[in-house]
Amino acid sequence: ASDVYKRQETDFVAKNEIFQTFVQQIADQALASSLVGGKDGEDVEALLGENGLKEELVDKTATIGEKLSFRRFEKVTGDVVVDYLHGNGRIGVIVAGNGASDDAAKEALKNVAMQIAAMNPQYISRADISADAMAKLKEITVDSALNAPDTLPKPILNKLIAKAVDGVWSAEDVAIYEEKKSNMNFLFNFLSKEAKAQLAELAMADKDAIVADKIFSGLVEGRISKQVKEISLLDQVYVKAEDGKQTVAKYLESVNKDLKIVKFVRFEVGEGMEKKNEDFAAEVAKQMNV
């Protein structure tokens, strides 16, 4: 199966028969080609060079009267391949699995495709996350924690506050601290924005020492683990889980222990463009009757 992301400027064009026919032509060529594509636009120019597609793209742009661009495509193969379109084609998902191809496997992969549409995982499993990606995730998590000092472990926070009180905070914020320090849970409700920003600056300045702290390290690892569960498909909680805990991996295992997902592709209208944040998860879950 092949999935193609084609961009146009208006919804009117998306419903245009000429446009739709051309998109199908690209999809057919992608399927026939030896090129495999990729999520970052790999092989797009090479595919456009096949069978006159580049010239067709120019011609269709002139005919329709709007700029058309072909951004990416991906090919998916497996013992069983299922697709799912959500929201009149706003989101498209293709999932490929190996190890089983009966009706139960197809139904399971269809459910997983709906899960992918709703929850937008980035990887099949945590094993697919590269060392570089994990390092970047850790860096972001560390900086996020340091820039939210109210969430830091108390021993670290207390050291930062001691520095802030000693000549960094304004007299007003120092007075607030002295008044509220007996109940630190409410301190940040009263501190000024400047005082909070100054604490974050102190934390970033002392980053190396804080990162070396075992308590902080545990906090970061916990947050990373939570994020990995959100971006790894098999680690996500299955949206139809009756107990609210069953993971996608456990769901597939309950259907057929040999059924394995080998690839999935998720395309969404407007990817790479500014768009409103919409609760697709709730919408898809409703369709799944959960």
Name every feature range the model reports, one short phrase each.
Residues 2-3, 7-290:
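N-terminal assembly/interaction segments in proteins that build large macromolecular machines
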